Amino acid sequence: MTRVKRGNVARKRRNKILKLAKGFRGSHSRLFRTANQQVMKALRNAYRDRRKRKRDFRRLWIARINAASRLHGLSYSQLIGNLKKANVQLNRKMLAQLAVLDPVAFDQVVTVAAQTRR
């Protein structure tokens, strides 16, 4: 059987993993096997949480819009439904920003939605 010399390749592969594990505590940043496990777990969690972040922000925006719209006597679903009927093209992120940072502008948006209801 022929001899396979892969010292550089193996070392580079291990160093790549150890570089990714920089900042981990204890053996998780020093020993290849534990570092490899932790890097794989970290990458898996990062992949999952990039998707989860989108869901979490949407929930936050909806909660903020709902709270602000109920101050004006409309529920969230009524507000969104009436805005769609009125052809107002504001997404949930922009509505939540208006509700928090510019309540006067949000009042005007709610007024448009309330007039559409009638």
Swiss-Prot record:
It comes from the Bacteria. Keywords: Ribonucleoprotein, Ribosomal protein, RNA-binding, rRNA-binding. It comes from Cyanothece sp. (strain PCC 7425 / ATCC 29141). HAMAP family: Ribosomal_bL20. The keyword Coiled coil does not apply. GO terms for biological process: ribosomal large subunit assembly; translation. PANTHER family: 39S RIBOSOMAL PROTEIN L20 (PTHR10986). One of its GO terms (cellular component) is ribosome. The keyword Protease does not apply. Belongs to the bacterial ribosomal protein bL20 family. This is Large ribosomal subunit protein bL20. GO terms for molecular function: rRNA binding; structural constituent of ribosome. InterPro entries: Ribosomal_bL20 (IPR005813), RIBOSOMAL_L20_CS (IPR049946), Ribosomal_protein_bL20_C (IPR035566). Binds directly to 23S ribosomal RNA and is necessary for the in vitro assembly process of the 50S ribosomal subunit. It is not involved in the protein synthesizing functions of that subunit. Pfam families: Ribosomal_L20.
